[in-house]
Every structure is written in C-alpha cells, then in structure tokens.
From Swiss-Prot:
Keywords: Detoxification, Glycosyltransferase, Nucleotide-binding, Transferase
Family under the similarity heading: Belongs to the UDP-glycosyltransferase family.
CC annotations in GO: cytoplasm
Origin superkingdom: Eukaryota
Classification via Pfam families: UDPGT (PF00201)
Transferase found in the keyword field: yes
SUPFAM superfamilies, alphabetized: UDP-Glycosyltransferase/glycogen phosphorylase
Name of the protein in its database record: UDP-glucosyltransferase UGT13248
EC id: 2.4.1.-
CDD domains linked: GT1_Gtf-like
Amino acid sequence: METTVTAVSGTTSSSVGHGAGGGAARVLLLPSPGAQGHTNPMLQLGRRLAYHGLRPTLVATRYVLSTTPAPGAPFDVAAISDGFDAGGMALCPDPAEYFSRLEAVGSETLRELLLSEARAGRPVRVLVYDAHLAWARRVAQASGVAAAAFFSQPCSVDVVYGELWAGRLALPATDGRALLARGVLGVELGLEDMPPFAAVPESQPAFLQVSVGQFEGLDYADDVLVNSFRDIEPKEVEYMELTWRAKMVGPTLPSYYLGDGRLPSNKSYGFDLFNSDVECMDWLEKQMNSSVVLVSYGTVSNYDATQLEELGNGLCNSSKPFLWVVRSNEEHKLSEELKEKCGKIGLIVSWCPQLEVLAHRAIGCFVTHCGWNSTLEALVNGVPFVGIPHWADQPTIAKYVESAWGMGVRARKNKNGCLKKEEVERCIREVMDGERKDEYKKNAMNWMQKAKEAMQEGGSSDKHVAEFATKYSSI
C-alpha cells in the first residue's frame, strides 16, 4: 500500500474580495472524505477566509481528487490517502475498518504533507479539520501547526454527542428530557428525535464512535468552529460556546444566496462529487410561482424499492408538480409503471443544482431528508419543509424544523417503520394548501432573514470568521 503524499497544484490565487496572494498565510481545509455535505460548508468557509486574506488549500483523498474537478480559485488542492486510493470508502464495506485505515494512513500522509510544505517554504499556519477526523488535530499540532475543529452539524446534535463524551448522558440516549431541564436544549427530544447512533447504539457502532469522538481532545484544539448561527438555536449555541469555546461561523453557503455583496460571483460550491442535471432548470421555468415540490434525500441516504414506490405515489397523489432527484445508483429501484405515472405531473432527474433550484421562484415546498446542509440551503431561500429523516443528525433537525422553527412538518412512519404514500400526500398538502401554509412560509422567510444577517458584513457569524482570519494572518 502506497503511503507517500501527492500534492496537487499550488498556483491559483484568489479573484475575490481582498484576495490571497502567494505570500498570504496558508490554511488547510480537511473535510471528511467523499462527503458532499461536509465538503461544501468547508469550501465556503475557505472562500470567506480568502476574502480576509488567507490562502486556502483543500485537502482531499487521492480518490476524491481523481474523480472530481478541482474547485478553482481561490483554492490550492493537496492530496492525502485513506488507504483506498482506487475507490475510496466504496472499497471497504466495513465502516469501522475504513475509519481505522483512514486514521492510520491519513495521519501519515497528512504529516508528510505538512512537513513537505514547510520544507518548501510554504508553512501552514492552521489546519481546519472536520471534527469527525479528530486524529488530524494531533497530527497538526505535533507538526507545529495550529488546529481548528469544524463541526458540520447543528449545535442541537453537538449537545447530545458532547454530553455523551463528557459522561453526563448515558447510552442508549433515548430522550433529551434531562438536557431540556438543564437548559442546553430548546426543544424536548423524544426517541424518534434523538440521533439514532446514540438512541440505538448497537445499530451503527462505528458511526457512533466517530460522532462522539468529535469531542476527543477538543479541549486542546486551538479553535472550535460550528456551521450554525446564534438565532437559530440560541440555547444550544450557548452550550457550545461555554462548554467547548465554540464560535459560530454559519451558515457557510455561497454568499450570492446570503445577500452578501462582498463576494458577488460566489454562486456555487465548485467541488461537486455528483454531476448536476440542468434540464430541470428549463422545466422549472415553465412552472407557476411556488407551485413545485422539490424532492431530494441527499448524497448518502438510501431507500429500498418499496419506500421509493410509496414516496413516488404520494407525490403523484398530491397533484402538485414535482422535481424528484433520484440518484443514478437508485433509479433501478423505480418501477416502469411509477416512472410513467410520475412523468405525467413531475420530472425525475439524477441530480440537480440544489441551491439554485431552491432559490427558483417556482419552488413551494422541499421534501428532504433534513441533512444540515440541505436544511440551511432551504432556510436561506425561505422554502417550507416536509421532513423525512433517515439517519445521523436528520431526525433531530426534522424535530427542530417542525417544533422550534415552525417551517413545516415531519412525515411519520407507521408502526412497522414504513413511510406510506398517504402520509407523503398529507404532508405536502398540509404545507402547500393547509390552514398553516401562510404561517410556514412566514416563518421560513423570517429565518431566511436572520440567516442572512448572521453572515452579512458585521453579522455575528461574519465577525467570528473575520476574527479567525485575523488571528492566523497576524501570527
């Protein structure tokens, strides 16, 4: 197994904001390999750091860089290895084995990268690492480089994992009543609302370990950054600030959608692991305002054929035009009968530019798995939700969407754990035609404004980004 690092590129320079020239202080950004929802927010943080004068380098595995176009200016890119250079995580069906190999080989190749950059006269000031890769902090600091943890999920979920790590919450964590009583949660979480890794620890032990392990050595991190903002979850943010010294730097989305004129050309993430389908934009142009249901369940969540049939029939029965994103590796699960039925009222695509679609005037509702990145994308565009959570942080986020933020409803599964077409239809009609439809839209627009205020010049999150950049540009 080859373990030497391959550095890629190193000559691009920023074309936005203040700019980051060749002599600028360098910051390395290390997201979880192959996870679009972890990579996208870190890229946007990098763009903002470049605006403030730092020079960002995206660090990805060799496999990811071999299959994905480089993000372009203002980023340099560099490679490490996860031990599976030919195919990434897909070559290792055992998550525990993959995470172990990633730590072993990733640590070695990251160390080599940091040392080679120092020898070449390009020393790295700080490594911003995905908190799921806690081992990266040790590597950076042992190499004389500062380390900043980046949490890509909301503080509400961080509270649960942080308290599990600290031993103040026991497994299985089946409800959040104790956390609510202590004032560190703003919403009461029941069994169906808790992160399933914590509520049913035997279901995904490897993912539970890396989720709780985000807090390993966090006291020693030089900085702790979170992709959230104060107004959206104030009690949870306060917990992260007081307990873990965290700073909110979100929502880390392309600035075009945040009304931030400082980075006017920043309209996309620029590092897509999947190819978008532009046909859908032409189709949307033919639809009426706020009439279309966008249906997307992310890059990781999978559903069996029966559940997809129920979802598809529920969409059709709602009588609303819909844009349904079914990944190419999932399309074979759809029956020809369902495809024909869907084609009469909606459009099925393998992928779409989700942020651009959510900003389109025709979108009136978002049926989503409630991944945090997707949730923030809908939030900054004022789009109400139907939440159909699958795993990880999604059930907790769905609870907040419905109970704390009043932006939509959560679809309930039956006693057998199955989503039925009648429930899908009911939820869509509730959000788009029900008595509370205006309330959902009003709340969505309110949160949209608060999210934009946090990231615009002088906003709470914007200040934290600027302070972080100043700290490392002045060392």
